[in-house]
Regions:
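Flexible, glycine/threonine-enriched loop-and-boundary segments that flank and lead into catalytic domains
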Residues: 54, 58-85
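Short glycine-cluster motifs
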Residues: 96-111
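Acidic, two-metal ion nucleic-acid-processing modules in DNA metabolism proteins
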Residues: 1-53, 89, 109-304
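Residues immediately flanking
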Residues: 72, 85, 100, 144, ...
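General beta-strand structural signal in soluble alpha/beta enzymes
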Residues: 70-71, 97-98, 130, 257
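Short, glycine/serine-rich, charged loops/turns that create anion-binding
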Residues: 23, 74, 102
Length: 304
């Protein structure tokens, strides 16, 4: 994240300089600078995400759109793609975040595998100054005064091409026990890197794990850190976008959790980090996602 933050917030040359540096003292200084840049990236991301969610909360009908389109003045263009991903994960539908300045908007969109974002933008091309990307991610430039018309056009197209909303698909690579998530095992997964659109990060399903602890995460407590337990084995998972008070699972609840695993360097050495992609009561399978999709279709007036 620190290397990526340089290109998002400053210049990628800072990250390149660190990778090429052969002097340990100079490298430490550059690394410290990258940490500062990454902190700025995190703050900008949190501020823009909060502003976007506030706009959507003020107009609840927009959350029922097939494609979420939200814009704001002066949002940092380097992080709007990350915010679009957060909105897509939260609402389970394609999301486009647009930063406006001097009458022009620069947007970044993300979409689940069930939706072709590039095809949607092609259908709206007359309203755009330029655009590019692929089915899952795209960027665009638009005149600010046309954002409203663009929102209507892309949702009209989506309603025609995708008449019944589908739940956000989540591909699981394997079922795992918490006891199997050891540092050596997770380190082996790095041999599958680099990860990206054509080679996504592996997702593991932890079944029938008990919620054994819940703590706020982040400077403002907008996220959760949850301890899950299976017998004598336990792990900590991070759930972003959900505060502890909003978590529907209490202590002792049995859940199924889909997680991405990675290694981070803690004070005591390498440790396993788990990011929770989805969580639901144990044993329910796909029922909650399918029911949510049907309910959204009902609210938006779609024939069931």
């Amino acid at each position: 994240p620190r290397l990526n933050a340089a290109g998002r917030m400053d210049t990628a040359a800072v990250a390149l300089k660190l990778l090429l540096c052969e002097n340990e003292e100079q490298a430490a200084g550059i690394a410290a600078r990258l940490s500062e840049i990454n902190t700025s990236r995190q703050q900008a991301e949190q501020q823009i995400a909060a502003a976007a969610l506030e706009k959507l909360s003020a107009d609840p009908a927009r959350v029922l759109d097939r494609v979420i389109v939200v814009s704001g003045e002066g949002w940092h263009p380097g992080v709007i793609g990350i915010v679009a991903t957060r909105l897509m994960e939260k609402y389970g539908r394609p999301s486009i975040v647009i930063s406006t300045e001097n009458g022009e908007g620069r947007g970044s969109g993300r979409a689940p595998t069930s939706f072709n974002l590039h095809a949607a933008l092609c259908a709206c091309a007359p309203l755009l100054l330029r655009f590019g990307g692929h089915s899952a991610a795209a960027g665009l430039t638009i005149e600010e005064e046309k954002i409203g018309a663009f929102r209507k056009a892309i949702n009209d197209w989506a309603a025609k091409e995708y008449p019944v909303p589908k739940p956000l698909p989540l591909k699981l690579d394997a079922v795992a026990d918490i006891a199997e998530l050891t540092v050596p095992a997770v380190q082996e997964l790095s041999r599958l890197a680099p990860f990206g659109s054509g080679n996504p990060v592996p997702v593991f399903l932890l079944q029938n794990a008990a919620v054994d602890g819940i703590w706020p995460l982040g400077s403002e407590g907008r996220h959760c850190r949850i301890r899950l337990r299976q017998g004598g084995a336990a792990c900590f998972v991070s759930l972003f976008g959900t505060a502890p008070d909003d978590l529907p699972y209490r202590m002792g609840t049995a859940v199924d959790a889909a997680v991405e695993v990675s290694i981070f360097q803690g004070r005591g050495g390498p440790m396993v980090s788990c990011h929770c992609c989805a969580m639901r009561p144990a044993g329910l399978g796909n029922a909650p996602a399918e029911q949510a999709a049907r309910f959204d279709a009902f609210l938006s007036g779609t024939a069931l």
